[in-house]
Amino acid sequence: MTKLSKRQLDILTFIKEEVKSKGYPPSVREIGEAVGLASSSTVHGHLARLETKGLIRRDPTKPRAIEVLDEEELNIPKSAVMNVPVIGKVTAGLPITAVENVEEYFPLPETFAAPDEQVFMLEIMGESMIDAGILDKDYVIVRQQSTANNGDIVVAMTEEDEATVKRFYKEDTHFRLQPENPSMEPIILQNVSILGKVIGVFRNIH
């Protein structure tokens, strides 16, 4: 193995452990906390040296894009991660994961979905689901499906061709999309298109 300082080895080991346990790499802040470095610039310096040594690769445009290159030596299974499309907008008439809708891809553990299931992520805008623990700027992890049971949290397309995340209820004469915020009214629809069921939430802690 390329010669590393103790700090560099600690950082590389922490990245490896986070990828193996969570399926995606840690943030710079998390790395600093794990190895006892208060300065993010110092962490960036160590990451730059690891990159120079060919042990990691970074994408400076993304906060968590740290790829461990020495995977065989570090025993990181490539099959443990799937790249999930992050949807920037939902275009009526197009599949939810159409190229026109995808902003980027985010690594998640394959355990989030069965092999035959399709998963996407969507950024939450607003506070309509705060009582369900889904906050403004969170990303929901969504399993694609066109049906839902009463009480499921879903991504649905309204009659105005707008995507919304709400709790789903099918009632006698209509569908009710219920917010989880007592200050907001439900959306009542005669027709609704289900795009998927929310199965998880991802949040950046700043």
Swiss-Prot record:
Disulfide bonds: none annotated. Its EC number is 3.4.21.88. It is an enzyme of class 3 (hydrolase). One of its GO terms (biological process) is DNA replication. It comes from the Bacteria. The active site is at 128 (for autocatalytic cleavage activity), 166 (for autocatalytic cleavage activity). Residues 28-48 bind DNA. Keywords: Autocatalytic cleavage, DNA damage, DNA repair, DNA replication, DNA-binding, Hydrolase, Repressor, SOS response, Transcription, Transcription regulation. GO terms for molecular function: DNA binding; serine-type endopeptidase activity. InterPro entries: ArsR-like_HTH, LexA, LexA-like, LexA/Signal_pep-like_sf, LexA_DNA-bd_dom, LexA_repressor, Peptidase_S24_LexA, Peptidase_S24_S26A/B/C. CDD domains: HTH_ARSR, S24_LexA-like. It catalyses: Hydrolysis of Ala-|-Gly bond in repressor LexA. It holds the Pfam family LexA_DNA_bind. The record marks 92-93 as: Cleavage. Belongs to the peptidase S24 family. Represses a number of genes involved in the response to DNA damage (SOS response), including recA and lexA. In the presence of single-stranded DNA, RecA interacts with LexA causing an autocatalytic cleavage which disrupts the DNA-binding part of LexA, leading to derepression of the SOS regulon and eventually DNA repair. PANTHER family: LEXA REPRESSOR, LEXA REPRESSOR-RELATED. Homodimer. This is LexA repressor. It comes from Bacillus pumilus (strain SAFR-032). The gene is lexA.
